[in-house]
């Protein structure tokens, strides 16, 4: 009885019953017409019944399609939910690694601090959205007060690679290695200068004591090196700096580790501020491009200054700038506006100037640059 009820309720059974009924009804109606043969009546009735079966087949196929679409949608939602859970787990793990690494930067053991820095760099590599935050943490570590015996030694600047046998305390030497690790990791996290798709990350090294800082060939957003101690050598050659660059009062005035400052073929897309910067050795800006306002006001070039083939697309200030060594100011493109006021040079050195500039001798044996 139960099977019979199920069969009666089945759409398939109803379809066949309706098809049979239609076959009988159409066939019986056509047989009443004397001009219609029995075979034609059966054929027409069969077509009518078959049409019902065909309609049922179409409905059944559409129903199966909708069921399959709903199943796929449920499967997609389940997959998305699993992906969100996995992503949340990754974020939680990254947050925990980041927080733990930052905490370990305050550890007394230098090897623990080095490990914490590498862990932070690992977080940035696996989670690119952490890169700027990790760079901020590494820069803040370098901004911590630090001194070394070599930075305090008096005497003339010689080979920046030669410490003249001067070593710091064990704590200073260990801390120096930690700081050099931080500098290397910063460089590793910065994109290449020719990577058009990569963002420019900001660096805030205000007041930091850095040694052998080499950011060459990297893309940088905004860079702050105000009042920074630039020991040994500093290399920004081939950099592409998207944001403002501030080197105000940076440099190294004491110690034997006064090195060169290389900025060859560097592109400054916004303002570049070198006001009060002290270049203790050679400063190489050859082929650089300054797209924004450029300021060397009160800057001191104790060594040679090479600005040959530099391109200026905006203004340049050499207000009370002092050149102590050889000078080459034969620009590739002259600035739109120029400020020269007591721009001093040593006339005994080799001086190369644009055709419209000249030297004006002074009573003390020095000379200043003026526009002819």
Give residue ranges: language-model regions.
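Short, Lys/Arg-rich, polar N-terminal cytosolic tail immediately upstream
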Residues: 1-2
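Membrane-embedded hydrophobic alpha-helical segments
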Residues: 9-96, 103
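Transmembrane alpha-helix/interfacial motif
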Residues: 5-6
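N-terminal leader/targeting and pre-domain segments
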Residues: 75, 84-87, 96-104, 108-121, ...
